[in-house]
């Protein structure tokens, strides 16, 4: 079994974050990642489509984190950006937005689902996430920057969502949600922190490696792709 490849699928660069994508990419590669997704919030996109850096042995994926409180408008944004993005994330935070994201198979990840006194998920939404293949994002930055009762609440929400994810087989994605280079953590630090937060070792590995790779495979299908689960093999690929 080869060494796992790790991916951070939510990194914010200027003008959303503090650092340029080149700086974030260089440091992420140094920390041990195989790739990151540049996922600026949709209300803080650069005026021009950014040129993604080319780094040997490392890939920068084009992503976005959609911010929209109106479910109908959110679906419109998904349609607008889906074809041009490797990774499409929705910034949750209300039952209506969470539902709209989790019921849409064109969405890859739902980040920040919690709101008011809710963890953001329930049995119905967890089932929808599993059926539509929408992953729940576990974002490190809010946890690392929180203290006291706020952190306790966030950990409680995470525990509740983990239980639902396990029960309904909902995919999870671990990501830094970095707004600067100072928010980045190595894969080993991320895995260790995830386990402290309640994830099992295999769950954390899947969330930082297996699930991100599945997302890219889904959104960048090969030439023999028909639909999910069906692929036409030709020639030597059959054997």
Swiss-Prot record:
Q: Which reaction does it catalyse?
A: Endonucleolytic cleavage of RNA, removing 5'-extranucleotides from tRNA precursor
Claim: Secreted is one of the keywords in the record: no
Quote the EC number: 3.1.26.5
Could you give one GO CC term from the UniProt record? ribonuclease P complex
Which example biological process does GO assign this protein? tRNA 5'-leader removal
One GO molecular-function entry: ribonuclease P activity
Classification via InterPro entries? Pol/histidinol_Pase-like, RNase_P_comp-3_arc, RNase_P_p30
**Keyword Translocase tagged:** no
Q: Where in the cell is it found?
A: Cytoplasm
Q: Keywords for this entry?
A: Cytoplasm, Endonuclease, Hydrolase, Nuclease, tRNA processing
What family does the database annotate?
A: Belongs to the eukaryotic/archaeal RNase P protein component 3 family.
Report quaternary structure and partners. Consists of a catalytic RNA component and at least 4-5 protein subunits.
Q: What does this protein do?
A: Part of ribonuclease P, a protein complex that generates mature tRNA molecules by cleaving their 5'-ends.
The name of this protein is Ribonuclease P protein component 3
Organism ancestry: Archaea, Methanobacteriati, Methanobacteriota, Stenosarchaea group, Methanomicrobia
